[in-house]
C-alpha cells in the first residue's frame, strides 16, 4: 500500500542534503526573471517527474523572495516533540499523473544517483527537545492506508492549482498581491527524477546546516475581530502557470509549520494578521476595512504582516532552519496554507487598513490588556484525548511538522490552563470541539438566569458539538456577491419573554451570533441572530421572594433599585421586570463597539434595536403597551373590573400565572368563574382588547356595554359599518366602483383607500353619504402600495396578498381607515382595557362587487314588470348517444352535465349549493341514465344582480343553431 504519512515522507531522502541559500542576500529581481544556468544541451526530463507541491518546495529559487521577511527576536526555546526515529521507505505509485506534453520541463542536471538509505537520513536530523511523548504507530497506520489518488487536488474543487511546469517566456506581467493561496495536499509518493537527486546531492555538500530552529514567534499586539477561513482563495479562477510564477513572492512567504487536517481546530483560537484580500473574507466594523480587491485590481503591494522594518530598513538576519532545503536555480511557487476561520471577541478592535491608507487606525486612549492570554486549545483535554483522534503522530508545533512547511501567519506562545476538570467521553475523535465538563459546563449561551448575571464564557468553543459537516459549512468560502437569502443558513430560533427591550439587548449583546456583510451593501446584509435563550419570569413573579435588592453586575457595581410604583397586585412583578430589562441593557451597553465603528443605516436593524434600548416607557404601563398579543388568559379576576391604579398592566392577563388562578367571565349577567386551565381552553376574548368571556354568546350580549369603554372595539365597529354602507348605498357603490374600475384599467391591480380623520366624520358619512366625505377616496396600485409598506406594517402585506387574488372584472378592494382621536373616548368613562394592537388608526378592508351598468343611467321604471332573461340549457351541439349503454353513453351524458354547469357558473350560479335537488337529478341522469322532465329555476346573475329564468333540458336533442353560434365548442366537448 502506498504510504502517505506526511511526517514520515518529509524526512525522506527527497528533502535532505539540499543546498540552502539565504534569501536575504539576493538582489531584487522581477518576479518572472529566470536565473537558471541552462546547459548547452537540453537535459533529459522524465515524464514521471514528481508534481508534488511539497517536493517542489525544496526546489525554491531565492530570487523569488523579493522582500524576505527577517525573523523576530527568538523567544526562549520551547519544548517540542522529536520526530519519529524510524522513517519509512516509499514505493512509487503506478497511478502517478504524467506531465502535460505542451509544457516545458523544469531544468535539472543529470547524472543519476541511487536513493539513500536510513543511515544517511539519521545523520541530519534536527535536534529535538529532551521531552518525549509517545508516538502512536498503530494509529499512524490508518494514514498509511489512504489511497494516494484520493489526496490529489480535484479538478472541480475551488482550490485546485495548475501544474507547475511553465513554458519559458510565458509569464504574464506582475499583478497586485491577492492574499495567500490555500495549500492543497498532493501526491507525495512519486519517486522524483534521479537527475534531480544527483543535482541535489552535489549542491548540498557545500552548505552547512543551520541549527536555528524557531517554531514559535512572538505575536504582536493586535485586536482583530475575525480571521479568514481555510479556503479563502483570492484568485477568481484556476491559477495558471503564469499566475503561479508571477505572483508577488512576499504574499506567499511562510515562516512556520503547515497544519494537518485535524490540527486546523487546534490553532483556530490564535489571532493573527493576513495580507490584503477580498472583502468578503474580512467582516469588520471599522470604516478603514478592506475594499474589495482581487488580483486584477490596481493597488500597492502588501508590505508585510507586522509594523516592523523590512529589508530596506534593517540588515537581514539568517532565516530559521527548515527541514528541507532549497535549490538555487529553480523557478516555482510556494504552497501556502491559511488557518481556519475563527471569530472571537477581543477587548478592543483594530481595523485592517487598506493597502493605500495608514495601516492601523489610532486607538482609544484607554489602556489595553496587553498581557492577556488567549488559550488556543484546552491542553489538558488535548493530552487526554490525543490517543483517540490522532491520525498524524505530531502536532504542528513539533519539529517534524516544522520540516514539512512553514506557517503563513504569526503564532503565539501559549500556556496550558491549570487544572482541567473531568471530561466526558467524546462521541467523535476530533480535537477541536470540547466535551462538556461534569457539573461545570456553564456556557455563555445557557438558559439559566444565573449564568446571564455571571456568564463566565469559554471562548474556545464557538461552534457547538454538532455534525462535522455543519461546522465545516460555517467556514466555507463565502460568495463574492454576498450570500443570497436562499443560500444563507437559517437563523437560530429565539425564545424570549414578551419584553421587546430584553430581546433588543440580547440581540446586541456580544454573545449574539452576528454575520455582517461587506461595507456598503444593502440593509439586508446584517443579521442579528440571538442564541436560543429562554428567560422566564416565574422565578421573579413570586411576591415573597426578594426582588428589590441590587443585582451584582460583572463589573462589580451594584444596580440601583428602580423607582417604586404604587403597591398593587402586580407592583412586585413590575419591579422585577424593570430590573431585568435595565440589567440586561447595562450588560449590553458595556460591550458595544467603539466610537470609530461605522453606524448602520438610518433604518437599519441595529439602529432600531439600540433606539428600543435607549427608550424608556412613558408610564408604569408603558412596557405592557410594547408587549405583543397574549392569547391565553392568565390573571385572576375579570379584566373588565376597574382597578384603583388604572394601569394597563392590571387590565391584561398574565401568561405565566399558575393553573390554580381563577378567571371570571366579563359579562355582568353571567360572572362564571373557571380555573385557569379551563379558561385557557374555551374562554373567548374581545377582538380588540384583553377582555375575556366564557362563550361567544356572553361576548355578544355584553357588546353594548363593553364598546362604551373599548375604544378600539368601537372604532373597529365603525369601520365595519362603513364597509357595509358602501355595499348597500347605490350612489356610493356606483361611485366607488367607477373609481376602482378606472384605476385598474389605468394603473393595474390596486386598492381603493377611504380615510376618516375621526370616528365622528365616519358617522357623518353613514348619515349623509357622499356629501359627508371629508377626504376623497384614493386608488393606489400594488406597486405604489409597496412604497407605503413601512408605516402600514403587516396590514400592507395583507392588502398585497388580497390584491394579487381578487378578480378585477368582478370586484374591487376597499380599505377603510378611521383615526382614533382624543374625542373617541367618552368623558368620564371607566378604565379602558388594554388594546391588542395599539396604534393611531384602525384599518379594515373587504372585497366589494362592482356595480352593474353606468352610474349615470337611470334605474328601470318600477311600474311595469321588468324584462327577465331566459336561458335554455341543452346538451352541446354534436353530442350524440345519450341513450347508449356502457361507457360511451355515460361519457356523452357527462359532457352534457359539464356544459350545463359551465353556463351557470359563468353567471355566478352554483347548482350544488343553490339548487341541490336539481344537482342530484343531473347526477342520477349521468350515472344511471334516469331521465327527468325539463326543470325551471330562477337564479340571480351575479354579473348584473338581476334574476333570470333558466330551463334545464338535459335529455333533449341539442339545438341546431348552437352548433354555429357556440364559441367554446371545443371546451364544451372536452
From Swiss-Prot:
Modified positions (Omega-N-methylarginine) in chain numbering: 322, 749
GO biological process: cell-cell junction organization
Biased composition (Polar residues): 201-216
Keyword Membrane attributed: yes
UniProt biased composition (Low complexity): 623-636
Protein keywords: Cell junction, Cell membrane, Cell projection, Membrane, Methylation, Phosphoprotein
Disordered: annotated segments: 23-137, 201-233, 306-326, 539-576, 618-661
InterPro entries tied to this protein: Apical_junction
Biased composition (Pro residues): 69-79
Principal place of residence: membrane
Residues the record lists as Asymmetric dimethylarginine modifications: 749
Residues annotated with Phosphoserine modification: 52, 129, 468, 509, 512, 593
Compartmental location: Apical cell membrane; Cell projection, Cilium; Cell junction, Adherens junction
Residue stretches of biased makeup (Basic and acidic residues): 116-134
One Gene Ontology term, aspect cellular component: apical plasma membrane
Role, per record: May be involved in the control of adherens junction integrity.
Protein name: Apical junction component 1 homolog
Lineage per the UniProt record: Eukaryota, Metazoa, Chordata, Craniata, Vertebrata
Encoding gene, per UniProt annotation: Ajm1
